Regions:
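Nucleotidyltransferase catalytic core that binds NTPs
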Residues: 1-141
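Alpha/beta enzyme core
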Residues: 141-366, 370-382, 386
Length: 387
């Protein structure tokens, strides 16, 4: 019997998938690939069910001879292992970013006489409704809130882009780039206080109140599904911060980043050119601990932003603070620098990783923007924010 292969990236089997299977059965034994979470998030949406559950879904389809694991977007490994006579897919992959996948398959199969079968894509109300329901599920707080932690487990580095409105959120949500056979998209969104304030014509001094900031979150959440990292500035008074944490958790935000400064907030990139006061380690640890204590779930991350390098307090101070903040309950450390050379950031990461292998590190390479994600990841960085 000839072998025919197809790959599914879905949480729900609908008639479109069944049409593919039924057409495939006409040509031979049907092998179905299930794409891993890590591969899916490179060009598609995040799954709402586990990888194992998706495998079981496909195993339950009548006519499927074997289920295979596809751990890359491109089909090179699968074709090398299975050597299928045919690869079948909906004809929606003839255009857009997915065309690169089809071109890759055609090239692989042509090497030994295999063929691609394009089946008319199933456009109807039932399929549209299923797709819409999956998207709605992804946008629900209980699913969105935990997604950043899930991404940290499967992505070498979580790519995050700044958003400050529903429109910029849609751009972050829908942008997919293909380059030399590799797909990329943003994994998460950063709601920056600087951009939120600027969009409202206000200075970046924590003038925009939390009620207004929460409205921005609502606008973004209404039209997106990706996890949100919230710029919490200093967090304000500890007594106020605990209520901010409760609100963010309830809304479905995945992380809040607070910086260890006090008084009237000034943009970090001003450095020592303006007066900025760093909080004491004891006070900031108390704020972190208070925020963690009021959480109802473990999903929301409180990430401590260390400003020692910005304020020229030295590497030892930065490391001392970072370790203290983690001990106080911080789920991650953000280290910032206004130097154009990434050397001090990389030095911090290396020294921090020497003592702490697991706590996520966040960087924002606004000034040292010549460094690559691969370089950052090699030094232990887990989240990169473009803002």
């Amino acid at each position: 019997m000839k072998k025919i292969y197809t790959c599914f990236c879905t949480d729900v089997i609908h008639e479109g998938h069944l049409n593919i299977i039924n057409e495939a059965k006409k040509y031979g034994d049907v092998y179905v690939g299930v794409m891993t979470d890590a591969a899916m998030v490179k060009f598609s949406r995040f799954s709402t069910i586990s990888f194992e559950e998706r495998i079981d879904l496909v195993k339950g389809i009548e006519g499927v001879k074997e289920v295979l694991i596809q751990d890359e977007v491109m089909y090179d490994k699968i074709v090398d292992i299975l050597h299928p006579d045919y690869v079948i897919h909906g004809d929606n992959w003839k255009t857009g970013p997915m065309k690169a996948i089809r071109d890759n398959v055609v090239k692989l199969l042509s090497a030994y006489g295999g063929e691609v079968i394009d089946v008319p894509y199933t456009y109807n109300e039932n399929v549209k409704r299923v797709d819409a329901q999956c998207k709605e599920k992804l946008s629900m707080p209980e699913y969105r809130r935990k997604r950043l932690k899930q991404l940290l487990k499967i992505c070498p580095i979580v790519k995050t882009i700044e958003v400050h409105s529903g429109l910029t959120g849609l751009i972050a949500e829908k942008t997919i780039v293909e380059n030399d056979g590799a797909f990329n998209q943003f994994d998460a969104m950063w709601i920056s206080s600087l951009c939120d304030s600027t969009a409202k014509g206000k200075p970046d001094i924590e003038l925009v109140d939390m009620t207004s900031r929460f409205r921005t979150i609502d606008d973004v959440m209404e039209v997106t599904t990706k996890p949100i990292i919230f710029d919490g500035d200093t967090g304000g008074l500890t007594e106020h911060f605990v209520y901010t944490v409760r609100s963010l958790e309830r809304m479905g935000v995945s992380a809040v980043i607070i910086e260890d400064k006090t008084g009237l907030k000034k943009n970090s990139l001003f450095g020592t050119e303006v007066q900025q006061t760093q909080d004491t380690i004891e006070n900031f640890c108390e704020k972190i601990s208070a925020g963690k204590k009021v959480q109802l779930t473990d999903d929301l991350m409180i990430i401590a932003r260390v400003e020692s390098l910005i304020l020229e307090r030295g590497m030892d101070d930065a490391l001392t603070r970072a370790h203290a903040y983690v001990k106080a309950g911080a789920d991650g450390i953000m280290i910032h620098s206004r130097k154009k050379d990434p050397a001090e950031i990389l030095e911090f990461c290396d020294k921090f990783r020497a003592e702490n292998k697991d706590t996520p590190i966040v960087v924002v390479p606004s000034s040292f923007n010549t460094i690559t994600e691969d370089e950052l990841s090699a030094h232990g960085v887990n989240i990169v924010i473009y803002a």
